[in-house]
Regions:
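Zinc-dependent metallopeptidase catalytic helix centered on the HExxH motif
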Residues: 1-82
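Solvent-exposed strand-loop boundary residues in beta-sheet-rich modules
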Residues: 212-216, 253-255, 430-432, 485-487
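Terminal connector regions
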Residues: 242-277
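Extracytoplasmic
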Residues: 277-488
Length: 488
């Protein structure tokens, strides 16, 4: 529609056209506009497998949307998106991945503009662009001038989206939910509040989706888009007639990469507070509390893996007989990406898991139990000598009674319960000393698990985890060092 009437030229022209085409498609049809034959050039089995899984699990009812998500929302695409600006992206270098980066970013930027401006202002912007440049080309500066002429501020929404490869990153406080006094008509009022911080130097947009209602009638709603300036926080308030059942942070294009499910507390419906209600967002000075803890996550530079198998490079061995046995796993920040449809992970791989530890992304490393020839290490520097308490993080779902053999199935399908774990082989290495640590994964709790207190010198220290384990899989998510004088 728009592309056949006017087109960008000059620096960033391809990216501008991508964004405007996506914006036009979303405005007119509420659907994405991008399609490329490169989407089917490889990994067709994986694409169709994930599409079937998406539809079966209710994540979407659109085959095209699922295919686009599978192709563009891959670790290697994100890595390239973070490594170069859209203006500097050269499609002739690896066309398939370049087009995927353009699709990933342009769709997100288009949604930011549409949701941030609203349909009326977005339509006015596109209409003015076509009317002024029909049959001619325009430059990026012309687009921004048209926006300024119509009192439309693009910079606070998307920053320098053409030249800057940096993204916002969102942190969220704990969620507070209370029942307020009923309104003047006797209707119940429930208030949910939380703080959101953009801890990066690029502005960003978020919204929250939430579920409320009765057991017989669940209702999904969403907040309006909320602007969060760079290195700033806002407080968000939601009002409903019932307590929330679910609450999700939905960033657009951010270092979080995925939607984040938030923990919703239980509400005491008998206690009713007479206090001011907040609906929407307002500036906040909230920041995560600083502690003396030293945490090493699987995405940190202090995490590494090694193999004792002769000549083996980092790779994933997909189960024999799997329909994906000919697929090449994508790489996720140095480790093969793991998906439950692959089967078992014979080498350390990285899995996205909503309850795992992480600042922006929530992931863990995992490997199938084996002969002790695969190792993961969490390394850091202790700032001073003394007694330190060590904890090991595991994100575990509640146990459900399983039939014989279902534990192994759970390990392969991504259901993380203590039943798939076993006795870990761990070694604490410091100042040339090697100390074995006992840890029974079957007895582990979800969250931080205490591994003991140790008298240690200042300097480098490493906790090494082996794949020799009595369970089905080994999980390496995060460790925490805490000075013992601060207690547990």
């Amino acid at each position: 529609f728009l592309h056949f009437q006017t087109s960008a030229m000059g620096e960033g022209a391809l990216a501008i056209n991508f964004v405007l085409d996506e914006l036009t498609a979303l405005l007119l049809t509420d659907k994405r506009g991008f399609f490329s034959a490169h989407e089917f050039s490889s990994s067709i089995n994986l694409i169709m497998g994930e599409t079937i899984q998406d539809i079966a699990q209710g994540r979407t009812d659109s085959v095209a949307e699922s295919i686009q998500r599978t192709i563009t929302n891959r670790p290697s695409v994100w890595d390239r998106a973070l490594g170069a600006s859209l203006a500097a992206l050269e499609p002739n270098d690896d066309p398939r991945r370049s087009l995927s980066v353009l699709a990933l970013k342009s769709e997100a930027i288009a949604r930011v503009i549409l949701d941030g401006l609203g349909r009326e202002k977005t339509g006015a912007l596109l209409s003015a662009l076509v009317n002024q440049y029909r049959g001619r080309h325009f430059h990026a500066a012309d687009l921004y001038q048209i926006a300024a002429d119509h009192d439309i501020e693009l910079e606070p929404l998307v920053g320098d989206w053409l030249h800057d490869s940096s993204l916002p990153g969102f942190l969220v406080s704990s969620v507070e939910s209370v029942r307020l006094t009923d309104d003047s008509q006797g209707n119940p009022r429930y208030q949910t509040r939380l703080h959101v911080r953009n801890d990066e130097s690029t502005p960003g947009l978020v919204r929250f989706s939430f579920q409320w209602g009765s057991k017989k009638k669940r209702i999904w709603d969403a907040t309006e888009p909320i602007r969060v300036p760079a290195n700033s926080s806002v407080e968000v308030g939601i009002s409903t007639l019932t307590p929330l059942g679910e609450l999700w942070l939905k960033p657009y294009l951010s270092l979080n990469r995925h939607d984040v499910k938030l923990r919703v507390p239980k509400v005491d419906s008998e206690a009713r507070l007479n206090t001011e209600i907040l609906v929407g967002a307002r500036p906040s000075d909230w920041k995560p509390r600083k502690t003396a803890d030293i945490v090493v996550d699987d995405l940190d530079s202090g995490f590494s893996v090694r193999s004792e198998r002769e000549g083996e490079a980092i790779s994933i061995e997909i189960s024999i007989g799997s329909p994906f046995s000919d697929e090449v796993a994508d790489m996720d920040q140095g480790l093969p990406e793991y998906k439950s449809i692959y089967g078992t992970a014979e080498a350390w791989s990285r899995s996205v898991y909503e309850d795992s530890w992480g600042k922006y992304r929530h992931t863990h490393a995992l490997v199938t139990s084996g002969a002790g020839d695969q190792h993961a290490a969490f390394s850091t520097e202790l700032p001073h000598e003394g007694r330190w308490r060590l904890s090991y993080y595991l994100a575990l779902s509640p146990e459900q009674k399983a039939k014989k053999g279902e534990e192994a199935e759970g390990a392969a399908t991504g259901r993380l319960t203590a039943s798939v774990l076993g006795e870990y082989q761990m070694n604490l290495i410091s100042n040339g000393d090697n100390q074995k640590i006992e840890f029974d994964g079957k007895a582990a709790a979800s969250g931080w698990n205490d591994l003991g207190e140790f008298q240690l010198p200042a300097g480098e220290i490493s906790l090494e985890v082996s794949n020799a384990n009595t369970g089905f899989i080994v999980i390496a998510d995060a460790i925490r060092w805490r000075p013992s004088t601060l207690g547990k």
